[in-house]
């Protein structure tokens, strides 16, 4: 792994070039397997772990927060052993779609942050994302709410995910004009089979405001690994394969073939 770190503006937060996503923790990965993945990631030089309060509410028997709880247990366990200290691991989580904390009203953002901190067993998170937009809220209210968490010491840096480029620009403009904590990173869907929006809208926006860019679904839900080439491949992995089905097109398979040629 490239051990070089990327600074999130002037926030003091630095993240690895490859962030570990925690959306499977408590879903397809139990505590023991999740701990093994986290240990291996840190041992390889990684320092940033991404989760969300909603992970993994969609799984039968879950209610949301399972990933945060596992991550919190891992941090606590490593603090009791020779593992990495809290300051060595950048923790990112998100707000907006947890069943009990839907939306980005100031009251909800504050309450959801406190709930996430409790599950994680922390007094602050390094990076707090608006997970999805809330059209019922003006951007000004959301920007104020996130900045207030930074002022309170509960959040070190603000991130935006799944907002339109226009709403992100409005947020960044408002934060700059009102001396608030500015969004330091944007996280959007981006991979070799879905490039247009990220390259055409979000990358120029990030450059304009000095935001770091981070992609999710970088492997297109596993499609870019080449393991999904037929409908039968999708059916054989029902837990994860269904999300990759939309890429199973002649265009998508052409990308797989081109990738195989250069891999």
Task: Explain the meaning of each model-derived region.
Residues 13-18, 45-47, 83-89, 122-126, ...:
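Short, well-ordered coil/turn segments that N-cap beta-strands
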Residues 133-263:
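Beta/alpha (TIM)-barrel catalytic core signal, keyed to glycine-rich beta->alpha loops juxtaposed to Asp/Glu
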Residues 117-136:
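Active-site groove signature of glycoside hydrolases
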Residues 55-60, 98-102, 224:
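A short acidic, helix-capping loop that chelates divalent metal ions and anchors anionic groups
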Residues 8, 20, 34, 49, ...:
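Conserved, mostly hydrophobic/aromatic
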Residues 21-32, 95-107, 136-137:
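Active-site mouth loops of central-metabolism enzymes
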Residues 1-89:
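N-terminal binding-site loop/beta-alpha segment at the start of enzyme catalytic domains
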Residues 30-41, 104-120, 168-173:
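Short, acidic/polar
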């Amino acid at each position: 792994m490239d051990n070089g770190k990327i600074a999130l503006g002037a926030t003091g937060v630095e993240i690895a070039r490859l962030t570990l996503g925690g959306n499977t923790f408590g879903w397809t990965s139990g505590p023991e397997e999740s701990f093994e993945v986290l240990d291996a990631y840190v041992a390889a030089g990684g320092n940033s772990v991404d989760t969300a309060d909603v992970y993994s509410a969609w799984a039968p028997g879950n209610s949301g927060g399972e990933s945060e709880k596992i991550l919190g247990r891992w941090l606590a366990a490593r603090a009791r052993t020779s593992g990495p200290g809290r300051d060595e691991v950048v923790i990112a989580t998100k707000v907006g779609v947890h069943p009990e904390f839907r939306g980005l009203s100031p009251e909800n953002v504050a309450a959801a942050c406190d709930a996430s901190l409790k599950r994680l067993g922390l007094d602050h998170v390094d990076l707090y994302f608006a997970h999805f937009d809330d059209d019922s809220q003006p951007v000004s209210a959301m920007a104020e709410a996130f900045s207030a968490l930074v002022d309170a010491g509960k959040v070190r840096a603000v991130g935006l995910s799944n907002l339109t480029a226009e709403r992100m620009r409005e947020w960044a403009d408002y934060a700059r004009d009102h001396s608030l904590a500015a969004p330091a990173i944007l996280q959007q869907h981006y991979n070799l089979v879905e490039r247009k929006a990220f390259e055409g809208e979000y990358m120029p926006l990030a450059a304009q405001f000095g935001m770091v860019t981070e992609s999710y679904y970088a492997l297109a839900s596993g499609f870019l690994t080449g393991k999904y080439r037929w409908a039968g491949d999708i059916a054989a992995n029902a837990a994860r394969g269904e999300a990759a089905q939309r890429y199973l097109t002649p265009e998508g398979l052409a990308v797989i073939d081109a990738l195989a040629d250069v891999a």
